[in-house]
């Protein structure tokens, strides 16, 4: 699926710059959760379902990178995980998150170096963030940096940018240089009502 196939169905896919994305979320924020329900957006549920297969310890420290309004955090909480930090580019979306959902919330541009120490998280989940006009493949290096050895990273990549943005090469290279070991990799329904699929990847970090 290419950008021209989905941009009319999901308008934010037309955006190209970080500034445009932030402005769009400022307007869309109040309707975001409602639209996700109407669109049958299943990314958070699918990702947490896979994640919990490999992470039985519910006390681990997790980063929800690109947390939006907290949809992944809600799914994690439903499954017993409570030690969760959230980070997102949009202050508007962060302001909509229930105050008790995350331990810590930060406004962060994932395309830049993270102001975080290395090896501080047991796992990172990044859902709905690797998509048109949002976060680029090099952000994976920073996410891996903040994860402990043998920690997990679980992410989605919109299929429309998988090759166009170079995620196919990046994911393969991270395996080749032994930065991670990919455990699960498959195409998910993601936003089924819009005909938008995503690649879902779960990997163990190696250091």
What kind of feature is each model-predicted range?
Residues 191-207:
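Core SAM-dependent methyltransferase catalytic element
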Residues 150-158:
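Conserved beta-strand signature within the Rossmann-like core of class I S-adenosyl-L-methionine
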Residues 137-149:
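A short glycine-rich, Lys/Arg-flanked "PGG" loop and its adjoining helix->strand segment in the class I
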């Amino acid at each position: 699926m290419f950008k021209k196939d989905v941009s009319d169905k999901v308008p934010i896919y037309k955006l190209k710059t970080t500034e445009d994305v932030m402005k769009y979320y400022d307007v869309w924020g109040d309707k975001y959760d409602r639209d996700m329900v109407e669109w049958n957006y299943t990314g958070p549920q699918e990702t947490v379902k896979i994640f919990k297969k490999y992470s039985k310890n519910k006390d681990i420290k997790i980063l929800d990178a690109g947390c939006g309004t907290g949809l992944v955090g809600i799914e994690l909480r439903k499954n017993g995980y409570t030690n969760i930090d959230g980070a997102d580019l949009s202050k508007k979306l962060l302001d909509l998150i229930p105050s008790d959902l995350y331990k810590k919330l930060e406004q962060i541009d994932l395309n830049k170096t993270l102001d975080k120490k290395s090896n501080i998280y047991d796992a990172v989940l990044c859902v709905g963030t690797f998509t048109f006009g949002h976060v680029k493949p090099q952000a994976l290096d920073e996410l891996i940096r903040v994860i402990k050895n043998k920690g997990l990273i679980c992410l989605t990549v919109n299929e429309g940018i998988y090759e166009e943005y170079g995620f196919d090469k990046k994911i393969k290279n991270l395996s080749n240089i032994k930065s991670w070991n990919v455990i699960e990799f498959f195409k998910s329904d993601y936003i089924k009502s819009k005909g938008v699929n995503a690649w879902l990847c779960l990997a163990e970090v190696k250091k």
